[in-house]
Structure formats: C-alpha cells, structure tokens
A protein has these predicted regions:
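Domain-level signature for proteins that mediate thiol-based redox and metal-cofactor handling
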Residues: 2-104
Length: 104
C-alpha cells in the first residue's frame, strides 16, 4: 500500500466512525469516555488539532460540526442527557485513562 493509499484508507475509516457515531445519538459521550477513554469531543479535538496544522485559522466549532453533524448546541439540546451519579463516579475513576489531547 502506498502512503497516499494508506491516508485514503485512514480517512475512510475516520468518516465511517464519525457516521456511525452520528447515527448512534442514543450513546452518550460520558459512556464512551467511561468505556473507551475517548468520545465525540475527543474526536473533535483530534480533528481540530490536525486541521490547525494545515490551516491555523481553523475553528474548533468546525470540527464539532463535522463530528456531531450539527452544532454542539443542537446536539446538547436534542440528545445529551444528564449524567447519573454512577456515570459521574465512573468518569472520575477512569480519568487517568482518558485521552490526552493538545493543540486543538
């Protein structure tokens, strides 16, 4: 596989993951964080950090729009639920394993 083919495959995998998460509006970010250490917000941060290397003027809200398929305000209004005490407790417990992201 050439480097260009690898980049194309990786981009397709990212798009498929984003599309899947856009379809799974029933899955809360806190549950993703608690189970895997990353969530939609992490994807936004990774995307934004990569985009800013290409275009320093890239806005974080553009990454949110791309990952969520809508503005973050729309997502919160339509799909985000209040985290339970158990979810919050688990979030704090698993914090050391959460993704560490810079440059977004």
């Amino acid at each position: 596989m050439t480097k260009d083919q690898q980049i194309e495959a990786e981009a397709a995998a990212f798009r498929a993951l984003v599309e899947h998460l856009q379809q799974r509006t029933d899955v809360q970010n806190i549950d993703l964080m608690n189970l895997s250490g990353f969530c939609r917000n992490c994807l936004c941060k990774w995307y934004s950090a990569a985009a800013r290397k290409i275009d320093p003027e890239f806005e974080f809200s553009e990454a949110q729009q791309r990952v969520y398929g809508m503005s973050i305000d729309e997502w919160k209004r339509d799909y985000q639920t209040e985290a339970s005490e158990e979810q919050q407790r688990r979030f704090e417990e698993t914090k050391p394993q959460h993704a560490k992201i810079t440059g977004y």
